[in-house]
Amino acid sequence: MNKEKEFLLWFEQMERGDVAIVGGKSSSLGEMTSKTDVPVPYGFATTAYAYRYFIEKSGLKEKMQAILAELTDVENSALLRDVSARLREAIMAEEMPEDLKAAIAAAYEELGKKVGEAEPYVAVRSSATAEDLPDASFAGQQDTYLNVKGAENIIAKVKECYASCFTDRAVYYREKQGFDHIEVALSAVIQMMVFSKAAGVMFTVNVATGDDSNILIEAAFGLGEYVVQGTVTPDNYTVSKAENKIVDRCVNEQDVMLVRKEGGDCEELPVPEAERNVQTLTDEQILELAGYAKKIEAHYGCYMDM
């Protein structure tokens, strides 16, 4: 298999060296699926080749170059907004090539067979596909779509990921850094949706102090997006790497949470009164998560956030 000429790759076909093909998020998910026993919700990713194929076959390249030529002053906020919006609109207005749509639809159907669920709910996320450009140069704030169901909806969200390559922020960054907008590419991760009672993030180093003796866990009720976005104040748990025990905890009040809606998409709901000041994770769950964090850090050989 020539990975560089495939429209998509399954997680077990990817590894950390595939950043240029499927981006940072996708390659890390592939690495953990194929090289570790850490549980990872299953899925696949579209490739940089698929993105460039879409841009080329749709004739978007020339349209985008013409629009970008009008961006004569990147410090002109109104002009930047206008150009960026027109670039996104141009992408969304084009039909994805039939063979690419068919490949995504077939992979989604195969995903359903593999997990034993017809038309499963998935998350669709963008993944930057170049090692020398940070995520800020690619995707916008809205580059994650949760609780998506059905092939047509997934194809539409993949296109929205492509369009997120041209947020005002992303265009400004690339202009200031001298990067070619047409040379960027984006991968979209299509991953089984986890309907979590609680979710959050973990760090194997305290980024504020540099202390790497503990695992730091932040968790809140509902889906993890509210933790990442800072919408809620999560619980904080500190686990000693050496002793494998919880050495500190801070349980914070949580009034709202993000949860899935039946049929697709998500909604904000109030946290039940009885749970608002309750510890989000059990001690057993905290220690299990810390164990995974240590495994991932050992595998990569560097500090990790996840």
Predicted feature descriptions by range:
Residues D135-A136, V201, V227-Q229:
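Short conserved micro-motifs at the rims of enzyme active sites and ligand-binding pockets
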